[in-house]
C-alpha cells in the first residue's frame, strides 16, 4: 500500500473520529462529514486512475454531486436551527419532529 493511500485513509479515519468525538455542534459535524467525503473522493479518483478503470471514471463525480447535496441540506438545516433556537447544538434537532 503506497503512502498516498495511507495518508488518504488516515484523513478519512481522522474525520470519522472527529465526527464521533465532536458531535455536540452541528457545524463541526458537517465539517467532519465534508472531510470524509473529500477523502473518499480522492481515494476513489486515485484508485481509478491507478487501475486504469475507464468505465468507473464517473463514480467520483457522482460522489461529489451527493456531497454537494448533503452540504446544501446540512447548511440549510444549520441556518434553520440557528435562527430558531439561537444555537447550533445537535440536541436541538430532535425538537424539529412534528
Curated annotation (Swiss-Prot):
EC number: 7.1.1.2
Native source species: Felis catus
Assembly behavior: Core subunit of respiratory chain NADH dehydrogenase (Complex I) which is composed of 45 different subunits.
Molecular function GO labels: NADH dehydrogenase (ubiquinone) activity
Protein name: NADH-ubiquinone oxidoreductase chain 4L
Family per record: Belongs to the complex I subunit 4L family.
Keyword match Ligase: no
An example Gene Ontology biological process: ATP synthesis coupled electron transport
A Pfam short name: Oxidored_q2
Amino acid at each position: 500500500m503506497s503512502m498516498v493511500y495511507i495518508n488518504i485513509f488516515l484523513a478519512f479515519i481522522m474525520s470519522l473520529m472527529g465526527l464521533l468525538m465532536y458531535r455536540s455542534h452541528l457545524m463541526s459535524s458537517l465539517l467532519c462529514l465534508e472531510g470524509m467525503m473529500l477523502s473518499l473522493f480522492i481515494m476513489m479518483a486515485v484508485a481509478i486512475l491507478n487501475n486504469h478503470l475507464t468505465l468507473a471514471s464517473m463514480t467520483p463525480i457522482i460522489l461529489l454531486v451527493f456531497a454537494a447535496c448533503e452540504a446544501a441540506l446540512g447548511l440549510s438545516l444549520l441556518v434553520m436551527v440557528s435562527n430558531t433556537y439561537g444555537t447550533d447544538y445537535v440536541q436541538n434537532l430532535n425538537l424539529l419532529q412534528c
